[in-house]
UniProtKB/Swiss-Prot annotation:
GO terms for cellular component: cytoplasm. The modification Hypusine is found at residue 37. Keywords: Cytoplasm, Hypusine, Initiation factor, Protein biosynthesis. It comes from Thermococcus onnurineus (strain NA1). It is found in: Cytoplasm. Functions by promoting the formation of the first peptide bond. It holds the Pfam family IF5A-like_N. Signal peptide: none annotated. This is Translation initiation factor 5A. One of its GO terms (biological process) is positive regulation of translational elongation. HAMAP family: eIF_5A (MF_00085). Belongs to the eIF-5A family. SUPFAM superfamilies: Nucleic acid-binding proteins, Translation proteins SH3-like domain. The keyword Transcription does not apply.
Amino acid sequence: MGDKTKVQVSKLKPGRYILIDGEPCRIGNITVSSPGKHGSAKARIEAVGIFDGKVRSIVKPTSAEVDVPIIDKRTAQIIAMTPDTVQIMDMETYELYDVPIETGVADEIKGQLKEGINVEYWETLGRIKIMKIKGE
């Protein structure tokens, strides 16, 4: 799978995802300037990185195409925990992944993780992040 696709800037909406500088980001705000006498309308996109939490912004013509990541949302079970990594097993394919706690776990759930619970994780561009704890 290519893990990314192209989408026209005018089709983007807040809450969707975009690649900025090779980093998958969630769009927070889009402002579109009106076209001038000698130019096309421009869109200013402000987004927050999924993995690093940094705020990024870009300005592009609304007719331009940008890369959008394909995010695979799956369920896994926590098999083992070490001080700096979490080992998870996919519930469908039974593949094992080692996820670093610092960059691969959402801040809201870092203290709630324990062995044996099910979690939802996102995989995109060869990277994994545990996003939330799944209910039983």
